[in-house]
């Protein structure tokens, strides 16, 4: 059965020179309007202050015509998800977010609603990490201990949000981002998409495309790498 996926996976909510979510406004509007979304259910669990975080997202989306409600305010979270028009899983600490989703038993309902019923899903940073098969390629400190690194698996590959290129001439002797991602590939034999700031992945059913004005870097399962230009067809990454 074909997937009903309707996803927008952002590298980040903030981009230098832009207001909160401003760089992704057109992408968000396209996604929400395609599904006639008027109210977005925000999942704030990647940060500690859920009320403040939800208010930040509300302040960004309301002027564009979208209401925002916080999942944390709902007495029955699973029912709220089932009644939602769209969900937005915000960034922050990926380990904290995933542990919260496990503790609240929300992984299975989200997975079902997104993959089988086509519930629009927006992820940013940590929210993008948990949308992938696992959180192994997050940049975050493991300040919390989820039961597993396995995540929602809305897409069958890994993403590294906030991807940074190695700095030419750097005197830093620690591992580069590339070396860490290459290590993951060596152990797991799975591809990782490095999303630079301002880029995102749009998934509609069995098709995916790279959005934004910068390249993404693909770390291939065989150990090679490839630069992918804006509007590149990423559908091949959806093949399990």
Swiss-Prot record:
Quickly give the catalysed reaction: Dipeptidase E catalyzes the hydrolysis of dipeptides Asp-|-Xaa. It does not act on peptides with N-terminal Glu, Asn or Gln, nor does it cleave isoaspartyl peptides
Name the SUPFAM superfamilies on file: Class I glutamine amidotransferase-like
Pfam families (alphabetical): Peptidase_S51
Q: Which UniProt keywords apply?
A: Cytoplasm, Dipeptidase, Hydrolase, Protease, Serine protease
Catalytic activity, EC: 3.4.13.21
The biological processes this protein is annotated with in GO are: proteolysis
Q: Which domain of life is it from?
A: Eukaryota
**Residues forming the catalytic site:** 125, 140, 162
The protein's matches in InterPro entries, at most eight in alphabetical order, are given as: Class_I_gatase-like (IPR029062), Peptidase_S51 (IPR005320)
Q: Which GO terms describe its molecular function?
A: dipeptidase activity; serine hydrolase activity; serine-type peptidase activity
Where found? Answer: Cytoplasm
Query: EC class of this enzyme?
Result: hydrolase
One CC-aspect GO term: cytoplasm
The record describes the protein's role as: Hydrolyzes dipeptides containing N-terminal aspartate residues.
The UniProt similarity line reads: Belongs to the peptidase S51 family.
Q: What is this protein called?
A: Probable alpha-aspartyl dipeptidase
* Taxonomic source organism: Drosophila melanogaster
């Amino acid at each position: 059965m074909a997937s009903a996926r309707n996803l927008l996976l952002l590298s980040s909510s903030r981009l230098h020179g832009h207001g909160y979510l401003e760089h992704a406004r057109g992408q968000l509007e396209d996604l929400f309007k395609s599904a006639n979304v008027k109210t977005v259910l925000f999942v704030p669990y990647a940060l500690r202050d859920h009320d403040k975080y939800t208010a930040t997202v509300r302040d960004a989306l309301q002027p564009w015509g979208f209401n925002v409600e916080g999942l944390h305010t709902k007495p029955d979270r699973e029912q709220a998800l089932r009644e939602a028009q769209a969900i937005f899983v915000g960034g922050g600490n990926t380990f904290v977010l995933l542990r919260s989703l496990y503790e609240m038993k929300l992984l299975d309902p989200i997975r079902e609603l997104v993959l089988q019923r086509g519930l629009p899903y927006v992820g940013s940073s940590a929210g993008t990490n948990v949308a992938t098969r696992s959180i192994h390629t997050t940049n975050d400190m493991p300040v919390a201990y989820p039961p597993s690194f396995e995540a929602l698996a809305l897409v069958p590959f890994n993403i590294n949000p906030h991807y940074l290129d190695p700095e030419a001439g750097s005197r830093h002797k620690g591992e580069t981002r590339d070396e860490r991602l290459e290590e993951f590939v060596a152990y797991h034999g799975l591809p990782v998409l490095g999303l630079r700031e301002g880029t995102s992945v749009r998934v509609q059913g069995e098709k995916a495309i790279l959005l934004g004005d910068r390249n993404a870097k693909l770390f291939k399962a065989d150990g090679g790498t490839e630069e992918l230009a804006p509007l590149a067809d990423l559908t091949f990454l959806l093949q399990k």
